């Protein structure tokens, strides 16, 4: 399998350096499972001041990211056979685990476009295949959403995480939240590990974990629980 290529267009590319040394994600980069490239639109500005923003037409507060340097940075990126271009914007579709899995599985290259300032020139949207948001809130730029996508996709690539089972069992992988985890000691400050987990009965443990997943999802994320029930008709939980 070829290396998973990630290209980020950002005015602050240095913030992505930390990912190269971040736990299993950093090891994936060092092992060649994934590769990270950053592209600063300022390097493609053509005026003497390397200007990348300007006042909005029609007036208004703030500055708008200009299209020319962004397009130039984007067009300088090598194109892989299977590529997806993602625009970070609060107007985008809220990020879901299914999106991360799809991008990590179906594509060999992701290009992440990060806005800044008040916003970006509307014509920049034409570069993107999808627009992505972390939620209904606004940040100063698209770098944190981009870092989230990088982390979330690289960890799903084969060879990054030690065992595939750990990916299957975690929250959202099957539409439910993950079950509780415990480790030693068996008792800590009068809080005990459930006896079933110490019983050695693997069938009972599996049933307990499945019930915990359902209970947690129903209590903490009723929206996910309703969706799971709709996808599993006849299951009473």
From Swiss-Prot:
Which controlled-vocabulary keywords does the entry list?
Answer: Cytoplasm, Methyltransferase, S-adenosyl-L-methionine, Transferase, tRNA processing
Record field: catalytic activity: guanosine(37) in tRNA + S-adenosyl-L-methionine = N(1)-methylguanosine(37) in tRNA + S-adenosyl-L-homocysteine + H(+)
Q: What is its main location?
A: cytoplasm
InterPro entries in UniProt? Alpha/beta_knot_MTases, tRNA_m1G_MeTrfase_C_sf, tRNA_m1G_MeTrfase_TrmD, tRNA_m1G_MTases_N, tRNA_MeTrfase_TRMD/TRM10
Superkingdom of this protein's organism: Bacteria
* Alphabetical GO biological process terms: tRNA N1-guanine methylation
Q: Which GO terms describe its cellular component?
A: cytosol
Indicate which residues the UniProt annotation says bind S-adenosyl-L-methionine.
115, 134-139
Please name one Pfam family that this protein belongs to: tRNA_m1G_MT
Task: Kindly list the GO molecular function terms attached to this UniProt entry.
Answer: tRNA (guanine(37)-N1)-methyltransferase activity
Localisation: Cytoplasm
Q: Which family does it belong to?
A: Belongs to the RNA methyltransferase TrmD family.
What quaternary arrangement does the UniProt entry report?
Homodimer.
Function noted in UniProt:
Specifically methylates guanosine-37 in various tRNAs.
Protein name as it appears in the record:
tRNA (guanine-N(1)-)-methyltransferase
Gene name of this polypeptide: trmD
């Amino acid at each position: 399998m070829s290396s998973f290529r990630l290209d980020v267009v950002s005015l602050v590319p240095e913030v992505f350096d930390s990912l190269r040394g971040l736990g299993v994600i950093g090891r994936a980069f060092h092992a060649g499972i994934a590769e990270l490239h950053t592209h600063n639109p300022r390097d493609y500005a053509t005026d003497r001041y390397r200007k990348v923003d300007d006042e909005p037409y029609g007036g208004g507060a703030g500055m708008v990211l200009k299209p020319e340097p962004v397009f130039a940075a984007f067009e300088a990126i090598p194109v892989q056979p299977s590529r997806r271009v993602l625009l970070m914007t609060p107007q985008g579709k809220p990020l879901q685990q299914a999106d991360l899995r799809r991008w990590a599985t179906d594509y060999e290259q992701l290009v992440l476009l990060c806005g800044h300032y008040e916003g970006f020139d509307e014509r920049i949207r034409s570069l993107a295949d999808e627009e992505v948001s972390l939620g209904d809130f606004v940040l100063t730029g698209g770098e944190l959403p981009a870092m989230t996508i990088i982390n979330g996709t690289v960890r799903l690539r084969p060879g990054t995480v030690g065992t595939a089972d750990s990916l299957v069992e975690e929250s959202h992988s099957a539409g439910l939240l993950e079950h509780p985890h415990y480790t030693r000691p068996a008792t800590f400050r009068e809080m005990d590990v459930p006896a079933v987990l110490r019983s050695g009965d693997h069938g009972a443990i599996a049933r307990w974990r499945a019930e915990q997943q359902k209970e947690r999802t129903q209590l903490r994320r009723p929206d996910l629980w309703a969706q799971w029930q709709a996808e599993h008709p006849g299951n009473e939980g």
